[in-house]
């Protein structure tokens, strides 16, 4: 298979784009790096498109690998013909390859294999030929009696031969392909109750929907209901229609005495072998389709959650509401450092409620709280009313927001939280997390397993590897889109930066704690286990506000520093002007040079890269 041509066609791209993307991936470049700093190579494809290409590339390479494994296996059996080889070369899916391989695949003992051991394959071949002049099947079977092998009667011989024919028909790639397509187009998914009791699955106790039209959430609900023992599920197809497909392949003559027996073998093949097998395939395909769609929804939800605008420069108070155990409180400064913690009771007695007001008011006034984050879990509404009344009584400009507390309890009980806050109780760590996720959602949420953030239904039913890869990719893309402050970022945040793994992230923080703040991007080259390739991949996504080189605090990659300085000089500016914010007319001056395209020619730089440099230089410091 020409993988480049296949991807080019599927994604409606040009061959050079796909060739370059594949080359960049094979060279070990990360998707964020390719998307951001190799735009000339691929024509400015975004990170989501690049991830889809990478996933398809992996699938097609695995497909080719399996194709050659099957080819080698059949060749090793000395059964590879030009026709089979061509069919393998033309197979576009794993299912097609497995259909071709099915007759040659080593099998466990079956009724057909036992019949072959009894020497009944020649009888099966004679019957299947359906010659008009052949004898009646039972008469033919008399020549294959063998009491020593358990073939006592003509009926025994005929039954064994028909078992062989049934298995051969069930292994026929053409029959399986046609029936699979028929199930997909005309099949019906049905579910019935397995227990006489009410449950959340009641809507599916007498449910049916076409395979083509059943919704993903319905598939996932039915799957879960079946796993939990509430539902019996099947995929059905009009049987006469299915038998007709088999007959169209099996029927060789309408005048042969053997035809009726062969057609009966075809019906047995469908009922006993083909229908259960294809039903499993269809259900697996439906589940995969539903999971893929659900993962896309989860990814979109997670992206929106991570990219919520942060509330910068304010002391925040986090409230983790609760009834019996009270409402946990934490105050953090503008950098997220914990200033105060406590527990208040606002849903108990009036005396405790008044005490809670007094405690919270003291915290707000002592630390100059500017914003309050309220978790949206149990007792959230009561806590919101209580907070609104308190703010009104204080009479100062304090705002509050209700934030998702999904994953806060998971984080608070994690090893990471214990390392970060060994002095705090688990419940108080949740309040800290709630306050911080208002200040900087991305930096706080990367500490939590994306699956625990609560981004969609049925997420725990998804294929773990696929869900982890998809959500991990979203987190990585979001972190790299925003950029990370090298001198304040936690190991959790740094580990999501392009080119940096968990070990290197810890090394970066350890080096920072031992040697002080990094003075520049280049300084991380001294970090253990961070080599030249890792630096290339991560440098552009790291920010160093303290650096003497203002470009270290932008999204301009170090490899483009000379181009950035040359552009500034061409427009009558310097790096000092960038630092002071005195380059407001940069875009107009670039246009005065004939636009980005003309400037790129003069500087021998790529147009997309130069366009990004202009955009980065104009961002506020």
Regions found by a protein language model. Give the residues of each.
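Long, charged amphipathic helices and adjacent flexible linkers at domain junctions
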Residues: 281-299, 452-485, 583-621
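Long, charge-rich intrinsically disordered scaffolds of nucleic-acid metabolism proteins
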Residues: 96, 225, 401, 407, ...
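A glycine-rich phosphate-binding loop feature that marks nucleotide/adenosyl-phosphate handling sites
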Residues: 180-188, 319-323, 377-381, 403-410, ...
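Duplex nucleic acid-engaging cores and interfaces of nucleic-acid transaction enzymes
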Residues: 49-52, 59, 63-318, 322-423, ...
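Short beta-alpha connecting loops at secondary-structure transitions
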Residues: 18, 341-348, 371, 413-426, ...
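Accessory alpha-helical DNA-binding modules that contact the DNA backbone or grooves
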Residues: 30-31, 42, 46-148, 340, ...
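Generic start-of-chain signal for non-secretory N-termini
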Residues: 1-19, 26
